[in-house]
């Protein structure tokens, strides 16, 4: 990651922490007081932030509202024809204003590893550290024409730098910047989300960042639409555009999902995910399964 981007990431994270310090008055904090409407904290993305499965939303993790601190943890498994992807992590939401998150991603190359020359069953690993700040608006309440808007940063660090560089990546770590707008139209039971992401990640960062040929940051889009059939059950679809810095035919992502709140604190998500071509192996479509516990 270039020095200007490192500086921007540091400044962005600092601003989020300053906002946290301004809001965090110990005498007013309700620890783990879960007062949000069920499902309105979203689920956990594969990168650890709150949102959908593959798209970040403006939501803040945990079930705490403006006077509390909440926490959530997730485990996600994606089963594809040639790969296996697992993510687990934790997120903290502070006063429905600031979110801090961490996720570890493990990407099993199975037989593809041998074909690519990195070894049968070689697993790519990545750490993702995230921070998000709600700027204005409310997901549920207020003017229906004013969404909840948040900015975020996700610093990603591949633990397989040699592999990333071997496929042509310029670096083994990088930072994504997001701007999200999300609104739940409660009277119609419809949720809509749009996210702009500035990124140089290859396959979410698992194959490094940028390219040795000079390709770097580009602006990508993430969108989600969901319908809430009941207080506890929602179905929807997501779409996420991807850069192709390495020239390996990296495709956009999409999924169709269903999420069910088994209890106020446990949400299960199942989806059909189409991740397209990954490292030249096409038609990577399969099951996305996730469990989230939130307080």
Where are these regions (language model features)?
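Bacterial N-terminal signal peptides that target proteins for export
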Residues: 1-11
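Bacterial N-terminal signal peptides
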Residues: 10-19
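Sec/Tat signal peptide C-region and signal peptidase I cleavage site
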Residues: 20-26
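Transmembrane beta-barrel domains of Gram-negative outer membranes and organellar outer membranes
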Residues: 27-190, 197-200, 229-233, 242-245, ...
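A mid-sequence, solvent-exposed acidic-amphipathic segment
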Residues: 192-240
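A cross-kingdom marker for long, charged
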Residues: 276-277, 288
């Amino acid at each position: 990651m270039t020095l200007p981007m490192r500086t921007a990431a540091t400044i962005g994270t600092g601003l989020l922490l300053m906002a946290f310090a301004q809001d965090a008055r110990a005498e007013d904090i309700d620890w783990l007081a879960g007062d949000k409407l069920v499902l309105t904290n979203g689920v956990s993305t594969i990168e650890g932030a709150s949102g959908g499965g593959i798209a970040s939303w403006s939501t803040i993790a945990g079930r705490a509202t403006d006077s509390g601190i909440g926490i959530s943890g997730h485990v996600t498994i994606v089963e594809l024809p040639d790969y296996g992807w697992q993510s687990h992590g934790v997120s903290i939401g502070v006063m429905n204003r600031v979110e801090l998150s961490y996720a570890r991603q493990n990407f099993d190359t199975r037989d593809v590893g041998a074909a690519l020359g990195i070894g049968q069953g070689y697993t790519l690993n990545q750490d993702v550290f995230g921070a998000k700040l709600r700027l204005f608006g409310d997901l549920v309440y207020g003017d229906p024409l004013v969404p909840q808007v948040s900015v975020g940063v996700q610093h990603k660090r591949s633990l397989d730098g040699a592999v990333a560089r071997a496929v042509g990546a310029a670096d083994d770590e990088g930072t994504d910047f997001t701007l999200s707008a999300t609104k739940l139209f409660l009277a119609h039971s419809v949720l809509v989300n749009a996210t702009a992401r500035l990124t140089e990640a290859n396959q979410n960062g698992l194959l490094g960042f940028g390219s040795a040929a000079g390709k770097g940051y580009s602006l990508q889009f993430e969108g989600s639409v969901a319908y809430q059939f009941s207080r506890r059950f929602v179905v929807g679809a997501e779409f996420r555009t991807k850069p192709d810095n390495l020239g390996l035919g990296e495709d956009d992502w999409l999924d169709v999902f269903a999420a069910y709140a088994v209890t106020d604190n446990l949400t299960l998500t199942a989806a059909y995910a189409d991740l397209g071509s990954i490292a030249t192996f096409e038609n990577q479509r399969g099951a996305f399964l996730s469990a989230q516990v939130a307080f």
